[in-house]
């Protein structure tokens, strides 16, 4: 299914009981709903637990439109896509699960429209991370030299998905996505669960991030990196317990 978000066509999916508590799932950079949440059995886990899953393909990804202008990927714009999706579905408030880029979008959602999101699970996020290497990643995606391990990780991941538009992904990584604002984080009142693998070398300064987010609880998954943390059973267990608290 598709909807219009201020002139950009975005794809979404609905799964699970119609009367279940709604939860929006937002994937990471160069991924999409199917890759991030279906193959990893998150959709199955949440729907079996009675949740109404709303899966979004972010702009630039999956089956959604793929603009080539970095300005189209400002964090506020990508968060507004989530708000418009809730409006399209006539949902006043929904829980939220986001990973990596999707976690940054969820963070922005709590700043911009906190009453539209309930309990929020943020995975694979810290104070900085891959977006600090945006220029290197974009250069690699555009066929230039690979100048860092982070750029190689994201280039290999992006190239591995035939549906990816590498120019759109380069625009996305170059979009206006500043580091968290400590004053804005301090005002967040939504309950937040942060989940990070202890071998994640993509995110940075997780402890600093948690210190500035007073409502957050941190769960660290042993032996998992940025990619392998997503399907971890410990991640699913912690998220379900948090969502159903």
What annotation goes with each model-predicted range?
Residues 8-65:
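Conserved HGGG/HGGXW glycine-rich cap/lid loop of the alpha/beta-hydrolase fold
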Residues 38, 44-48, 55-95:
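Active-site loop/oxyanion-hole signature of alpha/beta-hydrolase fold enzymes
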Residues 39, 190, 203-211:
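Short alpha-helix in the alpha/beta-hydrolase fold that links the catalytic acid
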Residues 92-130:
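Conserved hydrolase catalytic core segment
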Residues 168-184, 199-201:
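Active-site nucleophile elbow and catalytic-triad environment of alpha/beta-hydrolase enzymes
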Residues 188, 194-196:
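Short beta-strand/loop motif that positions the catalytic acidic residue
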Residues 210-227:
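Catalytic histidine neighborhood in serine/cysteine hydrolases
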Residues 224-236:
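Catalytic histidine-centered segment of alpha/beta-hydrolase-like enzymes
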């Amino acid at each position: 299914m598709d909807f219009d978000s201020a002139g950009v066509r975005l794809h979404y999916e609905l799964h699970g009981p119609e009367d279940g508590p709604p939860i929006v799932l937002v994937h990471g950079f160069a991924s999409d709903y199917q890759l991030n949440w279906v193959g990893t059995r998150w959709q199955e886990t949440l729907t079996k637990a009675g949740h109404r899953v709303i899966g979004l393909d972010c702009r630039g990804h999956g089956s959604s439109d793929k603009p080539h202008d970095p300005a189209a990927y400002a964090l506020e714009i990508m968060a507004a896509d989530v708000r418009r999706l809730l409006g399209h579905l006539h949902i006043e408030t929904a829980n939220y699960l986001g990973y990596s880029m999707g976690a940054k979008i969820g963070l922005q959602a709590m700043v911009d429209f906190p009453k539209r999101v309930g309990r929020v699970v943020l995975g694979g996020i810290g104070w900085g991370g891959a977006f600090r290497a945006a220029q290197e990643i974009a250069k690699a995606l555009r066929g230039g030299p690979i100048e860092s391990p982070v750029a190689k990780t994201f280039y290999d991941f992006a190239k591995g998905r035939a549906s990816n538009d590498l120019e759109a992904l380069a625009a996305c990584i170059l979009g206006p996505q500043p580091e968290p604002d400590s004053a804005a984080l301090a005002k967040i009142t939504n309950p937040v669960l942060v989940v990070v693998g202890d071998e994640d070398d993509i995110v940075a300064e997780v402890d600093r991030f948690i210190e500035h987010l007073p409502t957050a609880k941190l769960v660290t998954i042993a032996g998992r990196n940025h990619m392998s943390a997503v399907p971890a059973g410990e991640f699913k267990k912690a998220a379900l317990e948090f969502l159903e608290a």
